[in-house]
Amino acid sequence: MTNLRKNHPLMKIVNDAFIDLPAPSNISAWWNFGSLLGICLVLQILTGLFLAMHYISDTTMAFSSVAHICRDVNYGWLIRNMHANGASMFFMCLYLHIGRGIYYGSYLYKETWNIGVILLFTVMATAFVGYVLPWGQMSFWGATVITNLLSAIPYIGTTLVEWIWGGFSVDKSTLTRFFAFHFILPFVILALAIVHLLFLHETGSNNPSGINPDSDKIPFHPYYTIKDILGLSLMILVLLLLAMFSPDMLGDPDNFSPANPLNTPPHIKPEWYFLFAYAILRSIPNKLGGVLALLASILILLAIPLLHTSNQRSLMFRPISQTLFWILTADLFVLTWIGGQPVEQPYIIIGQTASILYFMIIIILMPMAGLFEKYMLKPKW
């Protein structure tokens, strides 16, 4: 069996990635989220596949087909609730995974980091088109508002929006193509995740100290497989608790009403995981400026490796940068809260302040703190 595991062309790849992989001996529970994201993706693809068997991508039938899944399909309610709340778990793990990457300096593996940012964009696109499918009020108006942002692009904006809609408004053709995108994109994510892993295994994992761990490595199995199973058990427990006891806690009540183009909901807002970006978008009064700020809020992740000024990789021994990191985290919580509030004072000014602070910490304060810490470490004699 050992020979087969180590010599068979296909098994060898699996063995080198998940069994005999040399891993640093000191990686903490923050390194669990990669495997949790993989499990989330598989869960979403499986539950999504069963939902797609019963879903009808037609404006007259979409809402009813989702109700039919919940009422008449065996365990349809559970599959639907697992899929909807699975998206929330996915983003929770994703944001913690990115946060860990920033805190411990994992972004210095540039190829892995860049593929990760592309993955983030793809997951966000998938979640957005998926949210439109139940064809409730918030689905319809969310699709209308977000696709309309492209009309801010000079010259080609309006044409581009109508091209995406497949008509002069969000309608049947929009829903059909969004369903097609939502079906294909998870497989693109799967392919990108494999490339992400490929680049990671070129260098090996980083560790909390940020020091080269080559002198002290242990096999991935059984040490980290057991550790990952613990994280997985906790995540599945939280997901099942959500799906079974309060499946609608993270959703929007407006989505229980079928889409009505003649009636606009009082507060159009996306799911909780997009609220921080939505707050940044709304904090700029100009439409094009808002769209650019929205893009910049995610694209700025690509600049983080270039803004690294410290001699140390991790924030473990850098108290000033640590403080800034936690201020940034608190700022993102504030932005998430503001994104769910109506556009009125004092929310407008809080959102604008939080948006400025977000960019300021990443572009100016963190690099300055790195330089200061580097200076403080220089011998003064």
UniProtKB/Swiss-Prot annotation:
Compartments where located: Mitochondrion inner membrane
Cofactor(s) in the UniProt record: heme b
Note: Heme 1 (or BL or b562) is low-potential and absorbs at about 562 nm, and heme 2 (or BH or b566) is high-potential and absorbs at about 566 nm.
Role noted for this protein: Component of the ubiquinol-cytochrome c reductase complex (complex III or cytochrome b-c1 complex) that is part of the mitochondrial respiratory chain. The b-c1 complex mediates electron transfer from ubiquinol to cytochrome c. Contributes to the generation of a proton gradient across the mitochondrial membrane that is then used for ATP synthesis.
SUPFAM superfamilies listed in its UniProt record: a domain/subunit of cytochrome bc1 complex (Ubiquinol-cytochrome c reductase) (SSF81648), Transmembrane di-heme cytochromes (SSF81342)
Record-linked Pfam families: Cytochrom_B_C (PF00032), Cytochrome_B (PF00033)
GO terms under biological process: mitochondrial electron transport, ubiquinol to cytochrome c
Binding site for heme b b562: H83, H182
Domain of life: Eukaryota
Recorded GO CC terms: mitochondrial inner membrane; respiratory chain complex III
Keyword Membrane: yes
Protein name, UniProt field: Cytochrome b
Membrane protein topology class: Multi-pass membrane protein
Sites where the protein binds heme b b566: H97, H196
TM annotation in the entry: 33-53, 77-98, 113-133, 178-198, 226-246, 288-308, 320-340, 347-367
Complex and partners: The cytochrome bc1 complex contains 11 subunits: 3 respiratory subunits (MT-CYB, CYC1 and UQCRFS1), 2 core proteins (UQCRC1 and UQCRC2) and 6 low-molecular weight proteins (UQCRH/QCR6, UQCRB/QCR7, UQCRQ/QCR8, UQCR10/QCR9, UQCR11/QCR10 and a cleavage product of UQCRFS1). This cytochrome bc1 complex then forms a dimer.
An annotated Gene Ontology molecular function: metal ion binding
Residues engaged in binding a ubiquinone: H201
Keyword annotations: Electron transport, Heme, Iron, Membrane, Metal-binding, Mitochondrion, Mitochondrion inner membrane, Respiratory chain, Transmembrane, Transmembrane helix, Transport, Ubiquinone
tRNA-binding found in the keyword field: no
The family this protein is said to belong to: Belongs to the cytochrome b family.
InterPro entries, sorted: Cyt_b/b6_C, Cyt_b/b6_C_sf, Cyt_b/b6_N, Cytb/b6-like_sf, Cytochrome_b, Cytochrome_b_C_euk/bac, Cytochrome_b_N_euk/bac, Di-haem_cyt_TM
Cofactor note: Binds 2 heme b groups non-covalently.
